[in-house]
Amino acid sequence: MTPIHYPETRRGDVVDTLFGEKIADPYRWLENDVRSDPEVAAWVERENKATRGYLDMLPQRARFAQRIRALMDYERFGIPTKAGRRYFYTRNTGLQNQAQLFVREGLHGKPRLLIDPNAWARDAATALDAWKPSDDGKYLLYSVQDGGSDWRILRVLDVAGGKPLADEIRWAKFTDLAWVGDEGFLYSRFPEPGAGETFQARNYDQAVYFHRLGTPQTDDQLVYATPDHPERGHGATVTQDGRLAVITSSTGTDARYELHTIDLSRRSRDGWKARPLVSGFEHDWKLVDGMGQQLWFVTNWQAPRYRLVAIDLGARNPEWRELVRQSDETLQQGTIIGSQLVLQYLKDASSQALVFGLDGRTARAISLNGIGTAAGFAGKPGDPETFYAFTSFNRPQTIYRMNLASGESEPFASPKLSFDPREYDIDQRFYASKDGTHVPMFIVRKKSIAAAGKPVPTLLYGYGGFDIALTPGFSAIRMAWLEAGGAFALANLRGGGEYGRAWHDAGRLANKQNVFDDFIAAGEFLIAGGITPRGGLAIQGGSNGGLLVGAVVNQRPDLFAAANAQVGVMDMLRFDRFTAGRYWVDDYGYPDREKDFRILRAYSPYHNIRPGTDYPAILVTTADTDDRVVPGHSFKYAAALQAAPLGLRPRLIRIETRAGHGSGKPTDKAIEEGADILAFLAQWTGLKVE
């Protein structure tokens, strides 16, 4: 192997003293915003040029780009939403950079284009994010995302004429969209950032506002805020019948909430008076819906794997009552449709859906198509139908329409594929981690490879954090890897939400090392089980999963042939200094508290690189407008990797422009990025594209 000559990166002399330990941070200057710091911008340009030169020489890149493009080229639909007689849904013909939004007058009406984000920006990096029609379908409230940023602009469309109203809301972020009749809506926003701080300033003082249609944002009414606790976040939802608004407050990313209610029928007398419902930030409360003054919630209060409870606020002495008790599976969420409840569960990281009466009595299970992920089941009281989606590793999303009276489902929108899903095998294995805990893992490969028992280059993916469950889903990029003869493995690590609160708690704060041990054990299992050869294992993870990749590469560099750390949290001593990073203390701890500092210092990827050790080939990927995990994390980590003597394998960084943490990325950019990553991983695991 010929050594790679990396661009030169200036080393600064920054040294912090934290709890008696001197911590060098020579690349602190790379935290500066690429838009305002010419030195950082020049560094990004040099690094991208070097990485581009390497990736373009890889013999399999063009073939991967061709196959990913072909695999993405199928018509796909979003789950329809009904409002009045109108049905709203998104559709992408295949290779459009952004999905379009359509409406039908009645289920079988002619589709009419309402919103085409592809016309918004020449580089297609402005995307339609969330959207919600008013209850009667007269208006459509939608949010616009630019350049991948978490900031949103809210706008309103008159559906009948297809014309936008003059209303425009700025500085919305992490917001629900909640109509109050058709007079206006509730939303959450932050104060406008200072000059030059749009993509880096810490997010404090989120508040809920009411916007009345036809008025300027400056006239919006403050609904709920906690100025004495600027660290708290607040969101608002409105029950389907419009009677109650529910304010959900949090202190971080952990699902421990306080709840307040606002009786919208008394607004002329009480204004936005919020009455406390749940206090203490101790448990998760997911609103199912409400009728009149009765509310239904999915909660882990006295039920680590969740149960369904209800309360009647109109009763003389309102009390919580249990409708559906905790089961062996993890209850994820619920909806009320017609006169029934649909509850969605996870069983070993795969979806189940059950229909109950409003009194909690079981009616029937919804038949899903094997191992996979279901989503949707939305609707209103009185609706005769609901729509849901189902997907798996080998099956792109199919939309189903379910008749609530008969319980029968029929396809509403099915993709036409350029591959045969039946050629692929999905297997779920359970392996023992370092401490003996059994951890589930999905393994996907061609049936012919599985039958032959042949070890092949394998891409192992993980996350392990923030109570987020990884479930089966289709990816054209992963399918291109499988088509080429590789295997894909998804490990359901501790720290995730696959098995309720205990599983999450076992992978956060002082238990974070369990996540890394689980991932390392997954790699060892794949090698020992003959799934992949030694020297054929690649790993990948994004965001918290990027941290995972960086940590395990430091701890076991010998185990992996290649690694792709995507938009990762790499400096665990400064993550809370930027944008939403301060929320993550629920999972990571506080860097300015000694006990937490010692834990973070021990695994922080940026601070634990091991000079003189042979490292795997590493491709770090990030984007210049990522204001969730700011790109400075990846910039500093890549600079430190390139400066250290870590062997001859490449350690490169790919920095996307006009993109963020992942959502809203144009199809063309996703294809190019996917081809770069697969070609890099294939080069160092020995995967040969057929």
Segments the model singles out, each with a brief description of its role:
Residues 118-134, 143-149, 160-166, 402-408, ...:
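Cap/lid segment of the alpha/beta-hydrolase catalytic domain
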Residues 484, 490-690:
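Active-site-proximal cap/loop segments of hydrolase catalytic domains
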